[in-house]
């Protein structure tokens, strides 16, 4: 897994200097791009808030939420977690901020996007709402999802929603590029008794999206 991360880092210079994609000039989506749908079959709207729900029963289920990272000295909650069961609290609402806003109020499969927890917060914690991928955690052998990212920049904050081979959708982390070969899957690891979203080689998290009323 660590080798895969290092490979992605080696490819970064190639992608960063590519003329086909920058944060100011994202790759255009094809005209037949497929909108992402929520649990009711409606297209995701970047102006609305949604809960990310793990598809599964019991310990395989549970909403995604913002929580305090173990051993973190950050002044605000900065970890992206999944509740331990589908019977429990509701997750933290999120907004999806697409890179192709000129296509209208839609979020498309395979579109580069940012994910932001849509919550009221103090000024100090505003920057701790945007998802990103943190540094390599040697104790867990992977990179953990956290907050503190940036919107619209080619950095550690780019994600995609793609159709799952099982049910629902998967989340991908795509550093600096819209090409799927540079993307890594988002799954779950166990950290201090909690289920933490992280980059995984196998068993990505299958999710659905439910609009927050």
Swiss-Prot record:
Keyword Repressor included in the entry's annotation: no
Cystine connections: 76-125, 174-183
Signal peptide as annotated in the record: 1-22
GO molecular function, one term: serine-type endopeptidase inhibitor activity
UniProt keyword list: Disulfide bond, Protease inhibitor, Serine protease inhibitor, Signal, Vacuole
Residues under site feature: Reactive bond for trypsin: 95-96
One Pfam match: Kunitz_legume
Residue interval(s) of motif Vacuolar targeting signal: 25-30
The keyword Membrane appears for this protein: no
Site (Reactive bond for chymotrypsin): 143-144
Cell compartments where the protein resides: Vacuole
First-listed, main subcellular location of the protein, grouped into a coarse class: other
InterPro entries in UniProt: Kunitz_inhibitor_STI-like_sf (IPR011065), Prot_inh_Kunz-lg (IPR002160)
Residue stretch(es) of the prosequence: 23-28
Annotated GO CC locations: vacuole
PROSITE patterns documented for this protein: SOYBEAN_KUNITZ
Function in brief: Inhibitor of trypsin (serine protease). Protects the plant by inhibiting proteases of invading organisms.
Family membership noted in the UniProt record: Belongs to the protease inhibitor I3 (leguminous Kunitz-type inhibitor) family.
Protein name as annotated: Serine protease inhibitor 5
Species this protein is from: Solanum tuberosum (Potato)
């Amino acid at each position: 897994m660590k080798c895969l991360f290092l490979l992605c880092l080696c490819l970064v210079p190639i992608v960063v200097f590519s003329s086909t994609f920058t944060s100011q000039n994202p790759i255009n989506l094809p005209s037949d791009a497929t909108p992402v749908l929520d649990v009711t079959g409606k297209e995701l709207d970047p102006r609305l808030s949604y809960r990310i729900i793990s598809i599964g029963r019991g310990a395989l289920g549970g909403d995604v939420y913002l929580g305090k990272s173990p051993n973190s000295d950050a002044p605000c909650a900065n970890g992206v977690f999944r509740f331990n069961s589908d019977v429990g609290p509701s997750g933290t609402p999120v907004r999806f901020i697409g890179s192709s806003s000129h296509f209208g109020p839609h979020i498309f499969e395979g579109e580069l996007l940012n994910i932001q927890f849509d919550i009221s917060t103090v000024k100090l914690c505003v920057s701790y709402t945007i998802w990103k991928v943190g540094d390599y955690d040697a104790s867990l052998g992977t990179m953990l999802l956290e907050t503190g990212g940036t919107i619209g920049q080619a950095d550690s904050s780019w994600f995609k929603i793609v159709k799952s081979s099982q049910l629902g959708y998967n989340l991908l982390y795509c550093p600096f590029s819209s090409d799927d070969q540079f993307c890594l899957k988002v799954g779950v690891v166990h950290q201090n008794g909690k289920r933490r979203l992280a980059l995984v080689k196998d068993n990505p998290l299958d999710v659905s999206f439910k609009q927050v009323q």
